[in-house]
Each structure stands twice: as structure tokens, then as C-alpha cells.
């Protein structure tokens, strides 16, 4: 149903927007926020009819009053009416001309450039700049002016400027609505995530499917970041997401499960279910994603397919040939056996799911990976989930934005557009987005920038509130918990996905005694700014597949900042564990070093009670802990206040010797008491 803006209706009715808003609220009970609000055409027509009827009624009343007055003094009234009519006609003519001449333009943001307002006013740049100079403002063509200044400037050219209270998120609301008409939906390719335990052949299986070798280029044979690939089978395409196989990458796997349609769980036939396999099963169940089990390495001598199926039943996954509904396909990435059957099962499962999308709408999807390329700037791998993305489109990606300058597929070929379920690399973003961010296509780059700026502002406000909002209760707790230590880390990596995964896995190492906090995470080389931040926060810098630049090295040596660089993630986690072990509060155990029997007691007024004792086992040491045991019951615990051998002070007295001793703050020593001497030894920690 068509709508009309309040200011447009006010113009038609020849009244001000303010008067119309008041009228709508008071007489018609129609709530409007401002002059840019829209009302239904039906309501507008009703208002026009009622107002025209009201005007006629008022006009009739005025005419009746006029006739009555004229009848009282016809000659005088006739003269006055002639003068009045002439004056009214003149004013009405001027007002009508002004109303007709007064154009209306709108601006959507708080500021507008001189160029933009010149185009809207349909005036030359020189004319507009001249008027601004007369108003005392020196501005160039590309300089921005605020709304108040724009309003005054527009008035000089007999134009009214209105500020459109536009909510940039409105554009996204239409995209987010998934109420697609059935006739617009078309079949789309399935999106597959491959999960599995480290070294179970997950990447090798993908290599076998894609008929390419990637594993050899990865450190330690482990995939270091997410990639997206498309393969063709019998004229149909399948999109694969490859997630790292280590347990530390829980966040990455979970992110993959959010965009995937089917999960392939790779389990080695000679190894069975392992910790990362259990995690992958949990993710699939939590995300309610269908699962296909690929039992890999069936060519190995120790392969036992039935054992794997048996272990799967413990997690509620019963194979189809065992009477369950879990698809299990024996495969070998080495010999390529079972690969075709696996792909066929994927296509069969996708047919059952009836995967559909509308390619004829604005695109939306998810960021699979993002990095900063020296030559090309921010490069992002996007997975289009709905609509069609085209070169030249403007998109919002989390708190960043851009206009797509170039687009390429997983083979590195330049393409012009990408439909649903297609992974593409793009150039043209203003910044490197976060892996897992959602992207949406909007009408133009200005709208995209507006949405991104608002999101950044919101994130900044939330950060400031959470960082600087300190209450007395918080301060008290920090003082009270003075023993709590914190290990601050700055994480830099080659790709955003690795940063996110490292952050989450490192923060999980936190214990009650040591808190691990990632102060900053970013993409690119370690620079001087990172060192400055580490100095201020007393933190350590971790680099993953990146190196520090020269300025960073000089600054770190000067400030004593520790920079650690790694190529394999296990090493990073192990080093942090070791660092944490040194920060943990030491644990102690009690070690009894000796016992002595009290044989005689001496009462000395100025000193207290002195016990003459015989060392039965071990030794007694001065300042060690001491317990007084009577009839097998500990009656007092303190420490040795003094220890003497004859008249000389002794550091320790060994077994078989007599000595004199006193107990700190205890004088009720009796003959026959046993003095047990002990020390507290620190336990060296081996694991967290």
C-alpha cells in the first residue's frame, strides 16, 4: 500500500508540518514521530476530505457573519471590504508565489558536502561558495557543512531543506526478512563443513576430493586457517568449508557449523573416536546439522571399521547398516577409494533437505576468512547464502563496509557475480572484517558507510562503558582480591580466523589464580604500537605466522617486552601454560623432620617454660613448626621459639642428642609430651 510523507501532505494542504502533526495526533489519533514519517494514502485522503469540509464550514460561517455586518453598515463596510480585498489579494498572490517557488530538498545525515548541496539546489559550485562566504563560512567543494548552515544556505535560494531521520538499519531489515515467496526460490548447492580429529586425514580427504595438494604447504601437516572450495559432480556443485582440526579451534568449528548444511565427520579407521571427534559431534548436535561419517584410512593395516561404528553408538550415532540413521562411508584419501560414494551421499542428503534460496534479491552471507594483503589491501572470503553478489555492489560487513572492486573464485579466476552457496574472495573493503561476520548488500556506499559508522560508535560506547565504568564495589573487590594475577597477551596473526581461535583457546587457560586476558588481537606484522600497548599493560606479544618489524624489535629491546613468534599453534599454547605455571600461587606440603620426648620441665620466671628433651627421630630445627602431642592428641601447634644444646644456641639438634627448647606462646609443657617438628615444602607444579 502506498504511503505519503507528512511534509508532502502538509504542502498539499498548504499548512505547516508542525500544524499537521498536531492535527493528526489530537483529532485523528494518528501517531507520527516527525515530518519525515509516512502515513497511509487512505488516511491522507480522509484527512483531506475532513479538512476541506471544515474549511467550507468555516467559510460559510464567515460569509454569514459578513452579510450580517454588512447589513448593519452597508456603505462603510463596502469601502472597508474593497480595501481589505485588495490587500488580501495582494498578500495571497505573494504567498502563493512564495509557496510555488519554495522547493524542498532533504539530507539524510548530520552533514552535507558543498558539492552535494549544490547538486540538490541545482546551482553552480561558485554560487553556493559565494553565498557561504557572505555568511562568513570559507568552504571548498568537498568540505562538509552542518544542517543548520545548510538550512540557512537553502533559504538564500528559496529552498526548504529537511533532515530525513533515516535509520540506516531499515535497509537491513528488508534483507533479514526471510519470508520468501515459494515461486522465487531455486535449488542451491549444499555447504559442507569437514570436521575431525587432528591427523585423521581431514585435509587429505579434501585434497583427494579437489584433486590438489594443500597439506604439504601447511606447517606440521595441519590446516592453519579456514578455506572454502567448490567441486563439481555430475553437473552439480558442492561447497566445502575446511576448518582446522585441533581442539583449540573450537570457535572456528562452531562458526563453520553455523553456515553449514551437512557436516562430514572424518574418523580414522585405525584410531577411532578421539577428543576432537567428540567436540565435533557435540557441535553438530548443538547446531542440529545433519552428519555424515567418513571412516578414513581404511587402507591401513590396523583399520577396523566395525570398531569405529561401535564407538559411534556411544554418542548416539548408529550406522545405517546397523539399523540406525547415520550415514557411514568407508573412504581412503590415499587410494581415492569411496570418494565417489561419499559425494553421492552428500548430494542425496542435500536433496532430502530441499536446500533453496532466492538468487534474485540483495545478497547476504557470512565472512569465512579475512586478511590484509600488502598489495591489494583487505581481502575477504565471503560465502553467499542468499541473493546474488555482483562486482560494484555496496556491502556492510560487521562494522566495516565497502564497494566490491573485484571478485574471484576459489581457483583465483576473476568473476562478475556469485549466487547462493558460492564462496568468493573480494577486494574493496575499508578494513579487515572479523571471520564469522555477516555481510549484507545495501543500495549504495554512503548507506553502507553510515551503518558501519553507527555500529563502530555503538561498539566504542560499549567498550568505554565496560572499560572505564568503575564503582566502589569493584574497587573494593579488587583490593580484597589482591592475590589475583593476570597475564595480558597481544595476539597478532596472518589471518583473522587464527586471531579469533587463538584468543578463545588462550582465554580458556584461565584459572582461579591466574587470569589470561587477550588485550588486543589483530592481523598483520607486529609493529611498534603493539609493543607500546604491551609495555603499558605489562603484557606479552604472540605472533602466529607473522614477524615483528625493525621498529618493533628496537622498541621491545628498549622496553623489555617479550615477543614470541610461532608457526604451529600447539607451541604457543604450551609456552603460555609454562608462563602461567610460574605465576601460580605455590602449593605447600607438610614434612615432619623430627620428634623429641620431653623428659624434664624447667619454669623460669623471666623466660617461661623450658623443656629438656631427647630427640627420638630425625632432627629438630630452630624456627621450624612444632606441635605438642599429649597421649596421641595434638594440644597445641606453633613453632620452636628457642633451641639450645647445653648453654649454646643451636640451629638444629640431631637424633640421639638431648636439647633444651621452648614453644612460642605455650608454657603448659609436661613431662612425657612429644614435640613433633615439621617444615612446609613447596610443591613444584608440572601441569595446570
UniProtKB/Swiss-Prot annotation:
Residues 296-299 are annotated as: G4. Residues 50-62, 86-95 have a biased composition (Basic and acidic residues). Residues 50-95 are annotated as: Disordered. It is found in: Cytoplasm. It comes from the Bacteria. Its main location: cytoplasm. Residues 332-334 are annotated as: G5. Residues 196-203 are annotated as: G1. One of the essential components for the initiation of protein synthesis. Protects formylmethionyl-tRNA from spontaneous hydrolysis and promotes its binding to the 30S ribosomal subunits. Also involved in the hydrolysis of GTP during the formation of the 70S ribosomal complex. This is Translation initiation factor IF-2. It comes from Clostridium botulinum (strain Langeland / NCTC 10281 / Type F).
